[in-house]
Design a protein with these regions (language model features):
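Surface-exposed charge patches in extracellular/virion surface proteins
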Residues: 49, 69, 78, 101, ...
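Short, well-structured hydrophobic secondary-structure segments
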Residues: 56, 64-102
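Compositionally biased amphipathic helical and low-complexity segments enriched in hydrophobic
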Residues: 10, 16, 27, 35, ...
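Fungal secretory targeting signals
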Residues: 1-24
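Intrinsic-disorder/low-complexity peptide segments enriched for small residues
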Residues: 7, 13, 32, 75, ...
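Signature of small four-pass
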Residues: 87-120, 124-126
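Extracellular glycan/ECM-engagement signal in secreted proteins
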Residues: 21-61, 112-182
């Protein structure tokens, strides 16, 4: 009887904090104010205008996506590594290493992991985020693609030419105002 009453009291009640399954990383909210030494990274053209780099859920290992300013990650480049400055532990942006570097696929997947990326180097070109590696020739080191589910890919082809179906060409840039905006 007692357990029935307790179950009835909690039926339909939502938990205020996320609950992780055993062994799963716990998502932590991104600060809404930029931390010292970090930048927001966002697209500045449609259809992803002011969509920000992050993972879903926020600040855990997973696919790199461009999404809402309300859950934006905060980043900087350290020794060629793009690092999420607000995740604990830090997350590093990884790039898929193709089997045939001389003829790579048009898209190279990106994701965040707790270990340092072993393939390529990230750099700023002005405020633009670039990625390069000597073994993969690219026409534009600042060319990215946003594809299904807002996933971010390295574009190994020409920017805005023969864009793969379901993807859009994008460049992404740092933004250093105190708060991310829409």
């Amino acid at each position: 009887m007692k357990s029935t009453i307790i179950a009835a009291l909690f039926a339909g009640t939502a938990l205020a904090t996320p609950v992780a399954q055993a062994g799963q990383p716990i998502s932590t909210p991104s600060p809404t104010t930029l931390v010292s030494g970090a930048y927001w990274i966002r697209a500045v053209t449609s259809p992803n205008y002011h969509k920000y780099l992050q993972t879903k859920p926020a600040n855990v290992p997973g696919t790199a996506v461009l999404e809402s300013h309300t859950t934006a990650g905060q980043f900087n480049i350290e020794s060629g590594q793009l690092v999420n400055k607000v995740s604990n532990p830090p997350l590093y942006l990884w790039v898929e290493e193709p089997a045939d570097k001389a003829n790579p696929p048009r898209t190279l997947a990106t994701w965040f992991n707790t270990t340092k990326n072993s393939f390529g180097t990230f750099a700023w070109q002005g405020d633009t985020l670039t990625w390069s590696v000597p073994s993969v020739k690219r026409q534009n080191v600042a060319a990215w693609l946003v594809c299904k589910n807002q996933a971010l890919f390295i574009n190994t082809g020409a920017y805005s030419y023969q864009t793969p179906a379901g993807c859009v060409d994008q460049t992404i840039h740092y933004y250093n105002d105190k708060t991310a905006n829409n």
